[in-house]
Amino acid sequence: MDEFEKAIIYCFDPNVSEDIKQKALAYTESIKVAPEAWLFCLERLGKTQIVLVKFFCLQVFQEIILHRYETLSKTDRLNLRTGLMNWFRLYLVNNQEESAIKNKYAQVMVLLFKQEYLENWLTFFDDFLSMLSPGNSSIDIFLRICKSIDEEVVSFDVHRSPAELAQNTFIKDTMRENAITKIVASWYEILVHHQSPPLINMTLQNIKTYVGWIDISLIVNDKFIPLFCKYLGVRVVRDEVCDCFKEIINKGMDPFAKLTLIQQLEIKNIINFAQLDDQEFNIRVGALINLTGMEILRSLESIQTLQQEGFDKKFQSGEILLEEMLQLLFRFFNNESNDVSYSVYGLASLYVQKLKNIKVLNEKQIQHITLLVQIVRNKMRYKTSRIEEDDDESDIKFADFRKDLSNLFRNIFRICPEMVGSFIATNIQRIVENKNNNNKNKNTTNSKNGTINNNINKTNNNNNNNTNNINNNTNNINNNTTNNNNNNTNKNNVKNANNIKNNNNEDEEDDDDMSFSDIEVSIYLLFQMGEGISATSEETLKSFEKFFGSMVVVLSQSSISITEHQVVSLIYFETIVRYAKYIPMDEQQYLSSVLKSFLDERGIHNKDALVRSKAGYLLNKLAKYLKVQMFPYINDIIDALKNHLIISYEIQKEVPFEEQLNFYESLGFLIGGANLPIEKEALYIEKILNNPIIKMEEIIAKQLYKGDTKENQFYYTVQLTQLINVIGTFSKGFSSFNATNGQLKPDAYCTYKVYFKRSLESIIQLPSLIPSNEDIKSRTFFYMHRMVDVLGKDLKPLLVKILPILLDHATTIDILLEFLVFYNQLISKYKEELFDVINPTLCPIVDRIYKSLNTTIPPVEHSDAERALNDLKKSYFQLIQALFTHNLASTLTSTLNLPLLFQQVFNTVIGGCQASGSHSESIQKVCFVILKKMIDDYSPGGPHAVNGFQSFIYDQVVPLCFQVPLSDQFNMSDFTSTQILLEIGKSLRAIAQKYGDEFLTYMNTILLPKLNVSQEVINQFIKLLQPSSPIKDFQELLKLFIRQKKGLPIKTSNSNINLNNNNNINNNNNNINNNGHTNGNGVNKNGH
């Protein structure tokens, strides 16, 4: 071993010291860059037996060919080529080399091939083919070279320059002319005469990569196809055979040729010949079926398009081919393995999509989708009756597959709603009758907290009647529904649906003669119909309303809900809630059976935590959907929930707090929307709120929160936040404002206020009592937001006391933001009525905002702190905007706040117009809107004219209206910037209206000349600033003027606008006098 070999070994030896390794790396690197490196490495390649040394030498060749090939002389290039071919002939083929060496040699030769083939080495393939021998590694190396040519020349997986793409195309064309026939012949010889599975697999890999761009007849013929079929029966090579068929079918060609090719291949017979004894192989075969079927569908669609354009029909057997693939589709789609089923899902989906475009389905097509519905049902069935929190990979894959199957089912439903409705009705009837028969001797389930009143019990004996009603309603669907795609096939649809057999029942575990998965999937498909119905006609929707209503009644009165299977319970409640609104108004007595299932041990008292939680959540949704229909049952619901409403850790071990919130919200909506007699409403509210209010008052009065520590997990403080939450959440059902017109309700209808006022008295104390707890403050704001709607005008007198308390405790930016949201809500709701409250509080609030913004250390870019500061700036400007929008602009001009207006507000608005950085556009837009409102309000003739405002207009506002859009940061292609420019146009027009000739003279003689604007354009400005001109014309002129100044192309069809394109377009906005300079952050330190 010489120094060279040692150096290479040292480079890869982890046990060598770092010093020696660095010396070795330096030595080998010097060899790589030497001018004669190729010659040195060629000599060493023929002498060494060390794999690392061989690899190094080949790597040197690769780098030279890639990066320094043009530096070699013609003689050096020829010697390099000859040397590599000699090494192949004398050494490589006669020794058992590592795969890494074989692959690296193939890569090097292909790089050399790309450089030399077209001009100097047209015999490349002849040279290698002449050296192929069955007794050595030559065939192996040649196949690797062919594969590497695909990677370097053909494959589109790598980004290539246009020049390289052109060269590669030329190489392929030359290969087609001179070499491909010989290469294909060599593949055939290998497949016929060699029994080595690795060689056969490599040959098949070559074929599948080349078949896409060579003459297809070279492969699809009587020589190759029988060989493929032969090897399809050989387990170790059949995967590659299957992939070859896929690539053959995937080859781009016109639709007639594609169908002829598929017919010639006889895929159906090939697949029937294969031994489908392995799941992985079945997936490959399924992928072949999937691709073949999709290609047939696409080809038939293309042929149909050509026919419409006047082409004669040239191919009659396409439908026969499609039928063959569909039969294979049904077979593989219904396979026990979901992976096999999914391999043909694309074909099933595409076929159904194609059927959606057919107006009238034939009998065969109806049979197809009927069978698909049954297969979808079979494949959707759960293997386990529980949903685990930590799903394994197989569970996640099944959930994803189920989503795809659901989408397929909904599309089938949209094609033939009456057939699917009949199929679902048959399934529901079967599972209901089965469960009812098995449970007829069992006692009806009782509520965990007692029997629900007689209103609910009256309907227990109606199961059989409503089961019989399913068929009646299904018949109504068939009689009344007009199928969007097929008006004449209802009878056939129903007949086919009723004839479907379950193909997989033998694998199920029985549960009282009925698998839980059968029950669950039948209800689940009924649920999915609601997703699909939205895309059908209004007539179809109406015809199904009665059907859905009857399904709800039957399910709720059946024994299905009495189950220990989690997945059945969950889909049962989901489906009930989805369709409960379709229970006919004259059959509302059945709602009692619906409610009963929610309120007893099937629902909110279920032993399964997930079912309990879901039932509570869905009961809340049901209360919002059907609050009017549920009014008669309020007392029963309260009784069923009474233990669940207690706020205590013991109860929350069984009923988490989030679920308790759902119950409070449900009851709030029911009671608040019931229009109950005053005494009855008060009784119900007392039942629900008395305990939380008393508990809150007790904790405050006894100062129990002071004993909280980490050890007791802040027991009482947490309880206080929960109590605020439940009272506030319950209040969502109550409002002092009429929902239809927004007017205040008479006091006689708002007697509930006493309970919320009483709660407010306690809650407003908490920020002062527990000032360090941010959750308490946050929940207090939540409650205050609710009180704006709940108390209405009764809240206003309390705000004088409440607002200072809340502001005092807004010590962090997050809480200050919450305060501003609440403050803006008050302004929006009460408007000018709130003047006496806003006027004294405005200055302290603005001061608090400025102090929070004046951070000594700027926040880290893109951090939460920066986000919070940006949000605070936005909230500040939204506050100023709200004052103008809701007739409270006079608060800024009051004696108390006028200094604030001049010293801070004006300057911050100007700064906001010049804002830069992230999200600055939104701040700029708001600030220009504010400027326009200031001009309207504070200029002469405005409702709140301000002395000295004129100087502000001329010194700052007008220059700003040109400076901002002319700045480099202003992007004319941005939508928000366009909106800002429109606002600027409005402001300038408003100034012209308020200040008249004085302003027009200023523009004519001072501002526009400073911008080097021609007199012609100045005249257009003056003309379009007149109130008599359309404002849109002025906004268009301004936009085009700014574009011209920025050197952007301008174009307008407006005849009133004519900009002189020879005008100086240099950006002279620096000439504009800007006395309102800020630091670009919108709101400046100290308000300047």
Curated annotation (Swiss-Prot):
Q: Which Gene3D superfamilies does the UniProt record give?
A: Leucine-rich Repeat Variant
Q: Where in the cell is it found?
A: Nucleus; Cytoplasm
Q: Which domain of life is it from?
A: Eukaryota
Give GO cellular component annotations, separated by semicolons.
cytoplasm; cytosol; nuclear envelope; nuclear matrix; nuclear pore; nucleus
Q: Does the keyword Transport apply?
A: yes
The yes or no answer to whether the keyword Cytoplasm is present is yes
* Any one biological process term the GO annotation gives: tRNA re-export from nucleus
Q: Region labeled Disordered — which residues?
A: 435-513, 1059-1088
Q: Which GO terms describe its molecular function?
A: small GTPase binding; tRNA binding
Compositional bias per record (Low complexity), positions renumbered to this chain: 435-503
Q: Which UniProt keywords apply?
A: Cytoplasm, Nucleus, RNA-binding, Transport, tRNA-binding
Family per record: Belongs to the exportin family.
PANTHER family assigned to the protein according to its UniProt record, in alphabetical order: EXPORTIN-T (PTHR15952:SF11), EXPORTIN-T/LOS1 (PTHR15952)
Q: What's the stated role of this polypeptide?
A: Mediates the nuclear export of aminoacylated tRNAs.
This chain belongs to the protein called: Exportin-T
Organism from which the protein derives: Dictyostelium discoideum (Social amoeba)
